[in-house]
């Protein structure tokens, strides 16, 4: 191991992005120390969607097998009108989709994905993991970086990665732009045992009912043991943070005009978790010397393209590649990393906002949306996804010949 690789990188944040960064660095032989504020290294939330771009990164991290074992691979992505209940559009996610993108589309419980990453990190001698450590100070003036926590503990390393999410402490040191911006949308999430879902709605699909100013998502998790429900509506009500109990009465009021299947599914849930959706405008500079940001700390995005976790995992792999290329010159590596990422992540941030309004359209705009989507072929739909699901070439170039061979065989099957 080269000497520069043995000097650890400090990673603030033990969520999906932080653990992916630690693992990507470890795969390159670089030591890291993860510092997590929560008392326990675990993930809060329910289901998330994984596009083909995420699976290319899982190839890089040698995680395809354990993630695939816990994921659901849906047959279709289906959008229905939330008022009439009629199907608007359907995108098959089977053989043609896999052939086009050479990877699948999957659904997984957030906690399961986090556990796979955590297990891989625990198995590496190059990764340290500490929970219950809230960062209160950073010093990057002494040829390295020192991170101080509320408990009085100090961590020293060659560089610092802030992967501490939407409410990032490290971002305020690097960017200093205050609190994130509420989007005017509120999300309620819950999971439902499959036995409680009526048989006619036990689809192996990523299904959602869209607009007006609301939408409901339904899809299976944990090999069909659970169904994930996500209900979103417009509201200017604001609560800081994102993990609190929701009010079923508020939800039913907002969805009162929706079709019977939507209202029936909402009635099945007694307890919801609620948070206010927030994001930030895209920026191109999220590094400062030996400190950089990753994932939601760098480019928080709304959920409407289902890319928050995917982008953070892409970030992790790209960042590790740039560190290796710079041979430990972290300031140069971090500038190269943000240069490689800011246009792609900024586009996702902007388009996620656009899709949020698109899904929640009302009146004539809703009719035009349904007409446009209803006239698309599956090929049209997939062509429109290429910018999102095709991984940047520089990340593809590092995939091993063995992995390339396995992917090619699967795509041609």
Protein language model features and the residues they cover:
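Conserved N-terminal helical subregion
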Residues: 2-9, 26, 51-193, 236-254, ...
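Conserved mid-domain beta->alpha element of the FAD-binding
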Residues: 10-39, 161-162, 188, 218, ...
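Conserved N-terminal glycine-rich FAD pyrophosphate-binding loop of Rossmann-like flavoproteins
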Residues: 40-56
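Short, flexible helix/strand-to-coil boundary loops that buttress conserved ligand/catalytic motifs
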Residues: 45, 61-62, 71, 91-92, ...
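Acidic/histidine metal-binding catalytic segments
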Residues: 69-72, 256-271, 330-335
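A short coil-to-beta-strand element that immediately follows conserved catalytic motifs
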Residues: 181-185, 202-205, 260-276
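Active-site substrate-recognition segment that forms the wall
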Residues: 204-239, 244, 248-250, 255-256, ...
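C-terminal lid/capping helical subdomain adjacent to the catalytic/cofactor pocket in oxidative enzymes
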Residues: 299-300, 317-325, 360-413
């Amino acid at each position: 191991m080269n000497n520069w690789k043995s000097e650890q990188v400090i990673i603030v944040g033990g969520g999906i992005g932080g653990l992916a960064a630690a693992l990507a660095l470890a795969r390159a032989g670089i030591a890291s120390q993860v510092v997590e504020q929560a008392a326990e290294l675990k993930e809060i939330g329910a289901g998330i969607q994984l596009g083909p771009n995420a699976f290319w990164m899982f190839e890089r991290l040698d995680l395809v097998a354990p993630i695939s074992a816990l994921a659901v691979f849906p047959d279709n992505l289906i959008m229905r009108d939330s008022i009439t209940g009629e199907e608007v559009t359907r995108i098959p996610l089977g053989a043609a989709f896999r052939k086009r993108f050479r990877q699948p589309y999957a659904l997984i419980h957030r906690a399961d994905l986090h556990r796979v990453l955590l297990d891989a990190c625990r198995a590496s001698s190059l990764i340290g993991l500490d929970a219950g450590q809230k960062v209160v100070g950073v010093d990057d003036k002494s040829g390295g970086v020192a991170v101080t926590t509320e408990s009085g503990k100090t961590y020293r390393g060659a560089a610092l990665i802030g992967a501490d999410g939407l409410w990032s402490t490290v971002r305020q040191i690097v960017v200093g732009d205050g609190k994130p911006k509420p989007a005017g949308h509120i999300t309620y999430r819950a999971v439902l045992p499959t036995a409680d879902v009526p048989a006619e709605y036990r689809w192996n699909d990523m299904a959602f009912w869209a607009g007006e100013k609301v939408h409901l998502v339904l899809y299976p998790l944990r090999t069909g043991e659970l169904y994930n429900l996500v209900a979103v509506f417009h509201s200017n009500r604001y609560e800081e943070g994102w993990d609190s109990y929701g009010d079923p009465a508020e939800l039913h009021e907002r969805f009162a005009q929706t079709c019977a299947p939507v209202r029936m599914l909402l009635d099945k849930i007694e307890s919801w978790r609620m948070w206010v959706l927030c994001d930030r405008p895209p920026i191109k500079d999220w590094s400062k010397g030996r400190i950089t940001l990753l994932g939601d700390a760098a480019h928080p995005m709304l959920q409407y393209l289902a890319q928050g976790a995917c982008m953070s995992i892409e970030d992790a792999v790209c960042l590790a590649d740039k560190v290796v290329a710079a041979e430990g010159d972290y300031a140069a590596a971090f500038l190269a990393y943000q240069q490689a990422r800011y246009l792609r992540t900024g586009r996702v941030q902007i388009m996620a906002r656009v899709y949020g309004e698109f899904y929640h359209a009302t009146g004539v705009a809703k009719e035009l949306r349904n007409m446009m989507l209803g006239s698309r072929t599956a090929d049209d739909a997939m062509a429109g996804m290429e910018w999102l699901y095709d991984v940047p070439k520089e990340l593809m170039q590092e995939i091993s010949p063995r992995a390339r061979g396995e992917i090619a065989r699967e795509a041609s099957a």
